[in-house]
Amino acid sequence: MKKIAIIGRPNVGKSSLFNRLMKKRDAITSDVAGTTRDVKRRHVVIINKEALLLDTGGLDQGCELFDKIKEKSLEAAKKADIILYMVDGKSIPEDADKKLFYELQTLGKEVALVVNKIDNDKLKDNLWDFYEFGTDAIFGISVSHNRSVNALLEWIYDRLPEEDIIKDEDEEDDVNIVEEDDEEFEFDDKEYNEEEEDDNFFYPEDDEDEEFEDDSIFAQNDRIKEFDETDANHIKISIIGRTNVGKSSLLNALLGEERSVVSSVAGTTIDPIDESMEYKDKQLTFVDTAGLRRRGKIVGIEKFALMRTKEMLENSNMALVVLDASEPFLDLDEKIAGLVDSNRLACIIVLNKWDIANRDEYDKIIQEVRDRFKFLAYAPIVTLSAKSHRRVDKLFDMILEIDKNYSQHIKTSELNVVLEKALRRHQLPSMRGQIIRIYYATQYETRPPKIAIVMNKPRGLHFTYRRYLTNKLREAFSFSGTPVLFKAKKRGEK
C-alpha cells in the first residue's frame, strides 16, 4: 500500500488537509501519544484506492524551527511514496521552503506542491509566485473553504496502483483498520501545541455525497491535463479569405465531395458551413466562412454573414488563410489575416490557384507573403490547387502537427533552462538606469501557449527583447504554426 506524507511548516494547514482526506472515508485508527509524538497515520480511500496517510504536523516552534521541520520532514518523506509539500498561499514563498522542496525532489518520489489558503478568487494570483519552485505539480486549494481539493485528489489517485482498488466497498465501510508498526519521531522536550493549526481545521458535515469543485487556477496546468484528455481529439478549423479566392473549393477538396457550393460569383457562401471528418483518430471540423469584402461593399444579409464569421473564428482553434496566388495581394487580405492574429489562432497560409500562378516567381511570391503578413511569421505556407486537388492532402498532417504545437505544455523546468540561456547570451537592457530582472517563466495556458514572465519591472520588458525571447523559445521547442504569447508580471502582483 502506498504511503502519502503531508509535509510543511506549522500552521500551513497540514492537519486540515489530513482531516479533509480522512473525511473522504471513515476507516480510522487511533493515535498513541507519549513523550514522543507519533506521526499520525491513517488508512484513507482516494476515490476507490487505498493508501496510508502520514501527517508530520505538530512540530514545535523553537528558534531552530526550520531545521527541525527539515529533519522530521525528510525522515517521513524517505518512508513515503507520495509527498504533499504544503505552503501558505497568503505568504510570499521563502527560500528555505524552496530549498527543502528541491531536496524532496531528489528523493525520486512523486512530489506535489500544495498551496493552501487560496480562499477566494482574489487570492488566485498568489499562485504565480509559487511557480518559482519549478514544478508543474502545483495545486492551489483552500481546505477550510473546500475549494479545488478535487484536482489534488485526482493527481494522487493517478499515482496509486490498480491493485489497491477496493473490491468490496460495502465490506470496507464496516472495517475499522488499526495500523501496526507505527514509527515514532523524536521531539525535543517542548510540548506539542495542537492549537497551532486549529484555525485551519475544516470539519465537514456528514455528507458522504459531497462534491469537490475544481476551480483552481493552478489550474491552468490542471486544465491543460483535463483538456488533453477530453478535447484534444477535436480540431476546429476556419477557412477564411476575401471573396472568390477558392475557400469553398478548398473545403470540397478536403472533404472529397461537393459540400459547399462553388461559383465564380463572389460571395456565394453566406452562412458559415461546417463539416467534420475523421483523420488519424482526430476529428477535424472545417468551417467555410463567408468571404469578406471591403466594408463599403458589405450590405444586407452579408452583415450577418460577417458577424457569423467572426463568431466562428472566436470558437476555432486554427485558421486556413486562403490567398489567391494568381493575383496581386490586397490590403484586404492583410486585414482578414489580422483576424487570425486578434483571435490568437494557429494558422496555415494557403496559396491557392497555384496551377495558374506564375510558378517561376515562387521565391518572389513567398517573400511577398512574408513581407505583407509579418504578424503571421510563425505560419507555414502551403501552395496548392483546390480545383485540381493538387497538394491538398499535404494539409492534413500539417494540421495535426500544428495543433500538437498549439496544444503543447512546456514544463516549467525546461522553460527556465531556455530562459536562463537566453539571459546569459543577452542581458536585459536597463530602464532609465534601473536594473531589470527576470525571475522565472511558466506556461499557464495552451491553445495558444501563454507564458508568464515574472520580473521586478514588467514595463521593462521591451518589445525587442520579447521578440528575442520568442525566437529562442521557437528554436528550443516546436511552435511552428502557433503564436506564443507573453505576459510580463510583477512578483507578488495581485
From Swiss-Prot:
Binding residues for GTP 1:
8-15, 55-59, 116-119
**Sorted alphabetically, which keywords does the UniProt record give?**
GTP-binding, Nucleotide-binding, Repeat, Ribosome biogenesis
Which CDD domains does the record associate with it?
EngA1, EngA2
- Give the SUPFAM superfamilies listed for this entry: P-loop containing nucleoside triphosphate hydrolases
According to the UniProt record, which cysteines are disulfide-bonded? none
One of the entry's Gene Ontology molecular-function terms is: GTP binding
Q: Matching InterPro entries, A to Z?
A: G_ENGA, GTP-bd, GTPase_Der, KH_dom-like, KH_dom-like_a/b, P-loop_NTPase, Small_GTP-bd
Please provide the Gene Ontology terms (biological process) for this protein. ribosome biogenesis
An example of a Pfam family matching this protein is KH_dom-like
Q: Which residues form the KH-like domain?
A: 408-492
Superkingdom assignment? Bacteria
Name the positions where GTP 2 binds: 241-248, 288-292, 352-355
Q: Does the keyword Ribonucleoprotein apply?
A: no
Residue ranges constituting the EngA-type G domain according to the UniProt record: 2-164, 235-407
Q: Which PANTHER family match?
A: GTPASE DER
Query: Which family does the UniProt entry place this protein in?
Result: Belongs to the TRAFAC class TrmE-Era-EngA-EngB-Septin-like GTPase superfamily. EngA (Der) GTPase family.
Cited NCBIfam families: GTPase_EngA (TIGR03594), small_GTP (TIGR00231)
Subunit description? Associates with the 50S ribosomal subunit.
What is the documented function of this protein? GTPase that plays an essential role in the late steps of ribosome biogenesis.
Tell me what this protein is called: GTPase Der
